[in-house]
Amino acid sequence: MDPLQKRNPASPSKSSPMTAAETSQEGPAPSQPSYSEQPMMGLSNLSPGPGPSQAVPLPEGLLRQRYREEKTLEERRWERLEFLQRKKAFLRHVRRRHRDHMAPYAVGREARISPLGDRSQNRFRCECRYCQSHRPNLSGIPGESNRAPHPSSWETLVQGLSGLTLSLGTNQPGPLPEAALQPQETEEKRQRERQQESKIMFQRLLKQWLEEN
């Protein structure tokens, strides 16, 4: 038998409560950490993964919807700009037409047409005296003269009117004198000759123009 056990016979009884206390201290769950230790533990558990600055990728459906919305906004913007441009052009055209219709005696329209008209007139203009006084139209009918009536024909007309005799109950004028009839006949004859000359000249110019074109 061990001498230590002989000397201390109560040692087994004392050791048993100590072992029970040690087992009781080791057996239960560890106690909760203090308030100062909790932040340190939280920081130690953080992982060096991606930070919060990196955006989380959106799902494909949301990406398509956002793309459609941006596309529709851009298309609407372009459509609005195109509509405004068309509106400005239409208003400008309407104002121009209104200005042309409101111009007195169509001065504005004649001013635009006059260069082409002058060009065509210069092309078919004749240098003879009769064509300068009577400008022929394209239809072959001579136009009106720009000058005043010939004084001789006016005088003959006045003489013929002065020779008329007015009587009650008779509406037939008296005969014209022979001196007034001769200048009138010669004037009519000259006028017919001038018309014939202008017609021939116009036909010649028209034929020449058709051959050139």
UniProtKB/Swiss-Prot annotation:
Residues 186-197 have a biased composition (Basic and acidic residues). The modification Phosphoserine is found at residue 114. The keyword tRNA-binding does not apply. One of its GO terms (molecular function) is methylated histone binding. Residues 8-37 have a biased composition (Polar residues). It is a single-pass membrane protein. Its main location: membrane. The keyword Protein biosynthesis does not apply. Keywords: Acetylation, Membrane, Phosphoprotein, Transmembrane, Transmembrane helix. The modification N-acetylmethionine is found at residue 1. It is found in: Membrane. It comes from the Eukaryota. The chain crosses the membrane at residues 154-170. GO terms for cellular component: membrane; nuclear envelope. Residues 1-62, 165-198 are annotated as: Disordered. This is Protein FAM156A/FAM156B.
